[in-house]
Amino acid sequence: MPKEFSRTQRVAQQLQKELAMILQREVRDSRLGMVTISDVEVSRDLAYAKVFVTFLCIGEQTPESCLAALREHEVQIRMMLGKQIRLRLTPEIRFYYDNTLVEGMRMSNLVTEVINSDKRRKHEAGRDEDEA
């Protein structure tokens, strides 16, 4: 019976859980706002981890400024992660902004615009036929 998940996927899931806990409880930085880890990709040799994050920015904060603040804590977060997980080597962590949520909202708005435009055209075409 084959394994459902490869080791890298299991490690990625565990890293996601542990990083979420670390960011929630240990990292104190007012520049971050609320951070959500949307995905973690681990290299095959488990040496590197790409951590995709989204932010709930407050006030003057932008996703770019929040990401810059988070990147300042990469070494500290990696040290805390090394204490939490049992791996021979703690992966080097790189944070990336995940814009899939923003892109999804943009696409949804475009679809809504097209539907509304189509309804307006049909309504206007129906009115023109009534007048003729």
From Swiss-Prot:
It comes from the Bacteria. It is found in: Cytoplasm. Gene3D superfamilies: 3.30.300.20. Pfam families: RBFA. One of its GO terms (biological process) is maturation of SSU-rRNA. GO terms for molecular function: ribosomal small subunit binding. Keywords: Cytoplasm, Ribosome biogenesis. Belongs to the RbfA family. One of several proteins that assist in the late maturation steps of the functional core of the 30S ribosomal subunit. Associates with free 30S ribosomal subunits (but not with 30S subunits that are part of 70S ribosomes or polysomes). Required for efficient processing of 16S rRNA. May interact with the 5'-terminal helix region of 16S rRNA. Monomer. Binds 30S ribosomal subunits, but not 50S ribosomal subunits or 70S ribosomes. This is Ribosome-binding factor A. It comes from Vibrio cholerae serotype O1 (strain ATCC 39315 / El Tor Inaba N16961).
